[in-house]
Every structure is written in C-alpha cells, then in structure tokens.
C-alpha cells in the first residue's frame, strides 16, 4: 500500500565520517538490521566497482550499505498511510487549518483546538506539523529563543529557537529503467559525503576544495528520471518572517540556487564515468521545500504544557513512520 521500493541505501564517506558511520553500523547490528560496512579505501573502491563498474569517486574510506532501505513516491505513499490510518480507526479531516489552542481553566493543558471548521475538544494533543511547527510553538507560548550549553559548561547567548533550511534538489531527464547494477538489480539510493575536491564537469572550475560536501542520487521510476539533491542551505530570514506557503514546488522564493545544477551534475560525474557531460540532461523545473530546525539541528520529540506532545523534525520519509509508532507507544 505504501509502494516502497527496497532497493537499498549506500552512505559513502571520506575519513571524517568514518567514526560516526561505524557507530551507526554497530547500532544496526544490535537490532538485526541488514547492512554491510566496508572500511579502507581499496576495499571500498573494490566493493563499489563490483556493483557499479564505472565508479570513480576518490577519497572514499567507508561504505555503509543498508540492504532493506530505499525510496517511494511521495503522494502515493501519503495516500497509503492515509488508508492504513483509516483502517486502524483514525478519522482524517482534510483541508482544515488549526487556528488556536485553548487551555483549560487554571491549567497549562490544552483542552481544545480551534480550527477553520469548528472546535475540537481533546485530552491529549500531538503536533506533527513539519515546517509549520513554528506556528504551534507560538500558540503554546513557548520560548522563541534558547541558550545552548557548550562542551566547556558555559552557555551561549540567546539563540532563536527556530530557523529554516531550504532543500536543493533536481532531476536528470533520462530513462530510470535503463540503469542497473552489475548484478542486474535496481540502483540503490547513493549518498556521498566527502571533502575531496569537486571540479565542475562543465567549466573546470573548482566547486568545493578542502571542505566537506555531500549529495545523493537515485534512478527514480516514479519521477521518470534520476533524482537527487545536496545539502540544504540556511534561510537568512527570521523564522517568523518566512513564508511557508505556498510550499515546495509551488514556491517561487525557495528554489535551488543557480549553482546547484553544476554541483549536482558534476558530483554525479565525480562518482560515475557514465555521467560525464550529464548537465545537458538536467531538467529545468521547480523543486525543493523548506524545513524548520532547532539551533543544534537535532529534532525535538517531547511533551509540553502537560498534554501536548510535539514531533519537531525537519526530516521526512518512511523513517518518520517509525517515530510516530514510538510516540504512540509513549
């Protein structure tokens, strides 16, 4: 019902990421999650070329290959979750906007939610609003700034509680079905993080040098092309001035910057020889979205105002279903 494609996921890294990825691998082993961890430049290169013979990325010293991960279609997956929720007894009201939270007399607990279509009384409220979490945080009169404890025990000055980051994503106009590994399987989702020098495949200019950069790509049968993206960039506006709507592809304000096309296509050529010159197949179209993040970029899953549980995470995808499951148990 979710149309998930378990093609696998590969986290491919330089030495700076090795320790963190090794820890992730050991955590996966503890819970029985099927993955392989390859260490050392020579073994990594051999492993990748056995899968993708034209692999040529330099400076790679570890590969975490998650066998059961993958990707799926955004809209169809959401409709699938809707069916599962309704089958479990949930009632979903679409096109409704929450406008205010009403607190009980003499208590900080929320007793009702005012919406564009009436008031809904509640004994427990769960807020899982993605980039709109800022709005509910304000409704709950929670602090707009925080002080962060540093490693030396001192605290920073007041830092805004919320800020936004914008995704940079794009696609190549190619037939995704034509891409297969040496084993005849679909490509896994490929994610690379490295500080190796990245040179423009189009101009020869240096894009990244002596700094960490990353991106991902995958042949996507739902988008009919190769889809991918790179690290999000900071939105410089204060959170309360950011226009979240219209969101995603409908937004004119938050779109990939001009330099993204060159970085994305050059990074693909950095990884695989066959993508040399692939900038000619880059789709000129709108893409992306924005995420709301905390000062340390870590998510918040916690109880507030006695009976309000907030899931504040800029991530997305199937892993959030796992978060929802854990929150429902709690």
Regions found by a protein language model. Give the residues of each.
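Dinucleotide-binding Rossmann-like beta1-alpha1 core, especially the glycine-rich loop
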Residues: 1-51, 214
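C-terminal catalytic lobe of FAD-dependent flavoproteins
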Residues: 234, 238-243, 252-330
